[in-house]
């Protein structure tokens, strides 16, 4: 479970990223965050795994107060929260399989990390994750030989190999063509339904958010202006979310 209680985030330059956010996201939900650029979507997601510190309030993830975590404790916590970025963050000249196994590095000794000594279990988990996103046949191909959609699937497989219950995604399909974007969203939906993973993603494509997510959270100027079922999002709500104020 993810629980925001009166969470605010103010950046060092005085910009308000979030203001008095109150949310509860239960295990197994598929939630899409929508809003204009700079509305606070990425800030909200990045607070969940501690990439952004909160300024005030309380943020609890699976009974852990995230804002109190530092150093080793924060790194340990992040192992259980998968993160998928828009830019894939893959090592280009390394195989797909090894890119996925890199998610297991935090549990390895320094010696094993230096020499790339992954265990049989690490390999099996990585192969299973690749199978779940439909690219097992690409396991021994270099990452830079894949299409954008395939690379994003590798990122998703890497997050799955952490064996986390929560998957965060920061604009995961914004760089993809419409057909490939739907294929990647299909993967998210299937993983959500088959494995009861909590999916929390921010997305510019409103039509995809409404089609795939069961719940929509709309952010405007760091505040939650809508939180409810996707089927109840009206044109009037979207007009309010995306209307530019003079």
UniProtKB/Swiss-Prot annotation:
It is an enzyme of class 7 (translocase). GO terms for molecular function: ABC-type phosphonate transporter activity; ATP binding; ATP hydrolysis activity. It catalyses: phosphonate(out) + ATP + H2O = phosphonate(in) + ADP + phosphate + H(+). The keyword Zinc-finger does not apply. Keywords: ATP-binding, Cell membrane, Membrane, Nucleotide-binding, Phosphonate transport, Translocase, Transport. It is found in: Cell membrane. It is a peripheral membrane protein. Residues 2-246 form the ABC transporter domain. It comes from the Bacteria. GO terms for cellular component: plasma membrane. Part of the ABC transporter complex PhnCDE involved in phosphonates import. Responsible for energy coupling to the transport system. NCBIfam families: ABC_phnC (TIGR02315). The complex is composed of two ATP-binding proteins (PhnC), two transmembrane proteins (PhnE) and a solute-binding protein (PhnD). This is Phosphonates import ATP-binding protein PhnC. It comes from Lactococcus lactis subsp. lactis (strain IL1403). The gene is phnC.
